[in-house]
Amino acid sequence: MSVADIKKAEIVSQFQRAQGDTGSPEVQVALLTARINELTGHFKEHAKDHHSRRGLLRMVSRRRKLLDYLKGRNPDSYRALIEKLGLRK
């Protein structure tokens, strides 16, 4: 397993609802947050990488939609996820 696969498996195991759960909104948001944080660091070095910036904006939008869905379906889980990931101040 590569480093990315190990990190991904660690994130999935931390946020999954049940064993083998990879599709719940909590897991998806956590994985997107990790990728967004990595790309944010990338842009500190490569400020003119507009192609990757477009991908970043798509990921942020997708995470926002998943968070809105989770907030409507399960507000307690939403609050716990926000707290755990440190997304809101």
UniProtKB/Swiss-Prot annotation:
Assembly behavior: Part of the 30S ribosomal subunit. Forms a bridge to the 50S subunit in the 70S ribosome, contacting the 23S rRNA.
Family indicated by similarity: Belongs to the universal ribosomal protein uS15 family.
The organism of origin for this protein: Bordetella avium (strain 197N)
Gene3D superfamilies listed in its UniProt record: 6.10.250.3130, S15/NS1, RNA-binding
GO CC aspect terms: cytosolic small ribosomal subunit
InterPro entries recorded: Ribosomal_uS15, Ribosomal_uS15_bac-type, uS15_NS1_RNA-bd_sf
UniProt entry keywords in alphabetical sequence: Ribonucleoprotein, Ribosomal protein, RNA-binding, rRNA-binding
Any one GO BP annotation for this protein: translation
GO molecular function, one term: rRNA binding
Name of protein: Small ribosomal subunit protein uS15
CDD domains to which the protein is assigned, alphabetical: Ribosomal_S15p_S13e (cd00353)
Role of this protein: One of the primary rRNA binding proteins, it binds directly to 16S rRNA where it helps nucleate assembly of the platform of the 30S subunit by binding and bridging several RNA helices of the 16S rRNA.
